[in-house]
Regions:
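Divalent metal-dependent phosphate-bond-processing catalytic cores, especially two-metal-ion Mg2+/Mn2+ enzymes
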Residues: 2-26, 49-77, 87, 97, ...
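Hydrophobic, well-structured mid-protein blocks that either form specific transmembrane helices
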Residues: 117-154
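Short glycine/proline-rich turn/loop motifs
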Residues: 40-49
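His-Asp-centered metal-binding catalytic motifs of divalent-metal-dependent phosphohydrolases/nucleases
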Residues: 78-99, 103, 110, 114, ...
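A generic structural signal for nonpolar/aromatic side chains embedded in well-ordered alpha-helices
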Residues: 43, 138-139, 159
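Basic/hydrophobic alpha-helical interface regions
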Residues: 30-32
Length: 268
């Protein structure tokens, strides 16, 4: 397969993210309670400092907040997952080198630093002691599976689902794909690995995506099945979209990818 032009795709993703951010904001904000709106307002004031965010963070937070609202509605989860997902990544403010955000040490640091920061913001915006306690419980463990520690508790697993579904959104999937040269050379291999991370041994995508023992071993540390039915349905739909895009070769053609990105991003 032809190699992906990383230098062409990444700017398209960043450009699309800017418009998508505001589209998401219009969709999400009216559905929030006053306290949650205050949390989001506080966060976006922080994001005015470019050193405090990665270019995709506004889209990630808004998209995952939208998903949290859906889980609260359809899976009857604790509404505090909304506050939790809004604040879950503020510990990254403490990382000077954002390029190393996915390292295990950074995962640990951002949970440790994010928990006390979130406590102050929650108290400042009218959350009770019990609500703060529950929300901090979610934030303090939300990336535990990436460091080999399982998460327990329905609300905490709900927040984990909200956070993790983002990686199959086209903005996140393709920014991860082009983040490393070796992935650009073998994009289907990257998609196959991610499929294994979400489904383990069994998935619904056909024999061409056969899961081997070697692939399971390779991805063992990242294998984590979604908790809730709403999440499972969304993830399956996103994999179907990413597979079709691979089959169509869209990411190999800058013009085609630009048009597809513009048309698709709003319905992700």
């Amino acid at each position: 397969m032809k190699e992906i032009n990383r230098g062409a795709i990444l700017p398209l993703l960043k450009e699309a993210a800017e418009a998508y951010w505001h589209q998401l904001e219009e969709q999400v904000t009216p559905k929030l309670g006053e306290r949650e709106k205050s949390l989001l307002d506080w966060l976006f004031v922080q994001y005015q400092d470019e050193d405090k965010k990665r270019w995709y963070d506004p889209c990630h937070i808004l998209f995952s907040t939208k998903f949290a609202l859906e889980l609260v509605d359809k899976e009857n989860l604790d509404p505090l997952i909304v506050a939790g997902i809004i604040l879950h990544d503020i510990g990254y403010f403490a990382l000077k080198d954002k390029s190393q955000w996915s390292a295990k040490e950074s995962r640990i640091t951002h949970m440790q630093e994010g928990t006390p920061r979130a406590a102050k913001v929650l108290y400042d915006n009218g959350f009770t002691s019990l609500e703060v306690e529950k929300t901090l419980g979610m934030i303090s463990v939300h990336d535990n599976p990436y460091i080999g520690i399982p998460i327990q508790g329905e609300a905490r697993l709900g927040l984990r689902d909200c956070d993790r579904v983002w990686v199959m959104h086209m903005l996140s999937f393709y920014k991860d794909l082009v983040s490393r040269p070796e992935r650009c050379k073998k994009p289907r291999e990257f998609l196959h690995d991610r499929m294994t991370q979400f489904y383990g041994w069994e998935h619904p995508f056909g024999a061409q995506w056969k899961v081997t023992l070697n692939r399971v071993v390779k991805n063992a540390e990242r294998i984590e099945l979604p908790r809730y039915d709403v999440t499972k349905e969304y993830v399956t739909k996103q994999f179907e979209r990413r597979i079709q895009e691979m089959d169509d070769g869209l990411v190999l053609d800058e013009d085609k990818f630009r048009k597809h990105l513009k048309n698709q991003i709003g319905i992700e």
